[in-house]
Every structure is written in C-alpha cells, then in structure tokens.
Design a protein with these regions (language model features):
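Cytosolic, membrane-interface loops and tails of multi-pass inner-membrane proteins
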Residues: 2-18, 77-98
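Interhelical loop and helix-boundary elements at the membrane-water interface
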Residues: 19-31, 92-103, 140-158
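Hydrophobic alpha-helical transmembrane segments
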Residues: 43-47, 114-122, 140-143
Length: 158
C-alpha cells in the first residue's frame, strides 16, 4: 500500500477584529508615534518664519505612513527568525494572524502611499529621504541586526 503525505496547514479563522488588530500591531504604532514626535520637533525647530500648519500636518501624516510601512516590512524580513525568540514569537507573522504575503503587500502599499503623499503634498526632498529610510532600514539595518552589533549605529541614522 502506498501512503500519501498530507500537509496540514493552520486553518484557524480569525475574526475581523483580530485580523485588524494584527495589522495594527504590524505597524508598531508606539514606535511610529515616537518617530512622528521627533519629526514634529525637527519640523518646528527648522521653521524659520511662520509655522505652516498644513505642511506640518501633511509631513506628519506622510512620516506616519512611512513608519508604519517600514515597521511592517521589517517584520516581514524577520518572519523566519521571529518564531525562534520568546520576545517576538507572538507577533502577527509568527503567530500566523497575518500571512507573509499579506504583510509584504501591506508594507509595500504603505510605503508607496507614503512616498507619493510626501512627494505630492510635502516636497521631493522629503520623499527622497523617505526612500533612503526605507532602503536603509529594511534592506541594510534589518539584515545586519543578526550579523553585527554595528547595526545599532546604522539603524540610528534615519
């Protein structure tokens, strides 16, 4: 008799609320808030003449979207090592509340929307700096975290 191998997948269904909370968790909102707070301080300190409220609000929205996207992509890159650490094993990807494809698409869309938002509603320089942050954090800092302690200094640049 032949025996067939059967692959079992985790088929637990999550409620809409659980799924939405998992997506919010992917964005690391507390860290994003701190990034926006420091960006707001920098914006204020860089203001020479009158404070441009509309530009300020648009900048903070764009930076928020960028921070959310980068945090999501960071977790996507670390999806294979997060289940191995107690501190990270309950994140949305290791706990299978979000699939890797969902996280990747979510992160890329957030970053693309952030870049377009910054380019059209803030300025080109801010959008370019946002792109530098995406590349530096997701493609340089995140992979280096497991290879060298120098990654801490690199991660502090953006």
């Amino acid at each position: 008799m032949d025996s067939a191998a059967v692959e079992l997948k985790d088929v637990r269904a999550f409620s809409v609320r659980e799924k939405l909370l998992a997506y919010v968790e992917l964005t690391k909102p507390r860290i994003a808030f701190l990034l926006v707070l420091t960006s707001a301080a920098g914006f204020y300190l860089a203001t020479k003449d009158s404070f441009n409220t509309i530009l300020f609000i648009n900048s903070m929205i764009g930076i928020s979207l960028l921070a959310f996207g980068v945090a999501t992509l960071n977790q996507w890159v670390e999806r294979d090592i997060d289940p191995l650490m107690e501190r990270t094993e309950k994140r949305p990807l290791p706990s299978k509340r979000v699939t890797p494809t969902e996280a990747l698409v979510f992160g890329l869309v957030q970053c693309a929307v952030a870049e377009a938002y910054l380019f059209f509603l803030v300025n080109g320089l801010t959008a370019v700096l946002g792109l530098v942050v995406i590349v530096g954090y997701v493609l340089v800092y995140t992979p280096l975290k497991t290879r060298t302690s120098a990654s801490t200094a690199i991660g502090a640049i953006p």
